[in-house]
């Protein structure tokens, strides 16, 4: 049996509600509109710190009390935020030390958000105190279903507080200055430190010549880790504060998908449930959106997550803020549910009238009534989710194929001085995920600390950094019969970004049965080629020049001085096999490779669908039923063969094996069937 992640009897539907921005007459009309839209859950108090605490010693919850009672009276559940995402002006005025210093050394003044130094003792004290006051005040309010700590944690600070805290962090991690010198390789350029006070933080005033370009990768990598840990400590202080008074209410904070500055795999260990905000750009493909959902599900150990925010239609920060076409909001909401969401929440309930988010989408527009396209679409979706009830809550995905993703690896790759400015870790992950996605292969995104034994295939694109013990885990996985795939620029460094000497790919050399002698970085537009399985494919970005040490050649380069050298290899290892892909290639190659390795591993698509129809399978809480989500991302209707007797939970229609189910443009079906 699988458990629900929170105390809800349906997929929660609602989102960020900011009544403090409006008069109380508007509140009453909001309640009417919420009923029409089938809203059942609201996130309150996200940015109310200045209202709740007008000075150092005064806490005034009077208005929030009225709001909390109003939503309770109207049958709404509450996700209660702690309001610490933006500090009040009086605090910045009285304690300027709480203000962040930017990467270029510029000290901030009051304004914006993400504006507090995470290592300011004053900020930490006041934020934790507010969280505790809120929890103590509302501990007997029985309508809170979750705590929402701060909001979209992020950013970095480079102030004196942070520099001092960085030295403390280094002492705890490395113990001696000699070890710091070793792991940072400070003999290079005469950077040897003899005293902790000599260490300065890395920014544009010291080791960096651009935000992502550093002269000492080890220093910059550790500062990234330190910054993520520092902000995590702020979250944990508030987590502990609310748990002291409300131990049974789950606690989360809204993450942001592939957000580079924070190591969410580490953060998720301290979250009762993962939640995140999904704001794809106009150019993002369905596979890119799906990958972000998979990452968020993955960091939570495969449990369902909360979709805490999405826009009902437009965002406000893109160069061109296009409308979501009719049906797309519904489609993307169900896509989130298919990949593990147990909520469908929006920012925002009512569109604000001032500042930078006044043109961000909302359920209730500036016209202030229900007579808008967006409201009608939201209300229709709300009715469907109400009818769906608790059917899909707590459902899980089957474990078959996985892609390894690691934040430290991400940071290290893109801090690297070479081999190519075009090398982006997320792009390489996406290439392999898209090939799995297009073939409807069940895929998890896992970290290097996760259990590998449940999977048949593990793909680790650009596993540049091999942390201690990870090579042994991979070897054990393959030895036991697993199929492992990795690529160019893998196995080069340890967890300090120090090169593993003795030949690339370092500790993976024996497993892969190859030695990479050198690597050719191709400028944009320059292409080599190789032929595999009768099809000719591109070789771009990086071309590894490798020698065989027990592997077999599956394909070779066709051009340049390394024509005839291996580009794709395979080595049998124990009961399994390890593949090495020496280049970035084209979509058809990735699809062919995925098809071959999944066939060898006995992994089959969850459904056969035409192009543009996504199929996702989840197993119900009782493990006796499963749900096949069919999502048509195309502007035309498409038909899907029904492979097993099923009931469509969206329409209520019964479908027999062998029949054809027609999905309209942007249409959705959820086929419930026996396992």
Which stretches of residues belong to each language-model region?
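Short, well-ordered coil/turn segments that N-cap beta-strands
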Residues: 9-11, 38-40, 72-78, 140-145, ...
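The substrate-binding groove and active-site-proximal loops of carbohydrate-active enzymes
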Residues: 12-22, 47-62, 109-128, 150-157, ...
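Short, acidic/polar
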Residues: 22-36, 127-133, 256-266, 325-333
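Aromatic-lined substrate-binding rim segments of carbohydrate-active enzymes
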Residues: 29-35, 43-106, 238-245
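N-terminal carbohydrate-binding accessory modules
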Residues: 1-43, 54, 69-73, 77, ...
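Polysaccharide-binding and catalytic clefts of secreted carbohydrate-active enzymes
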Residues: 105-273, 277-291
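Conserved, mostly hydrophobic/aromatic
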Residues: 15, 34, 42, 71, ...
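Carbohydrate-binding surfaces of carbohydrate-active enzymes
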Residues: 199-203, 248, 257, 268, ...
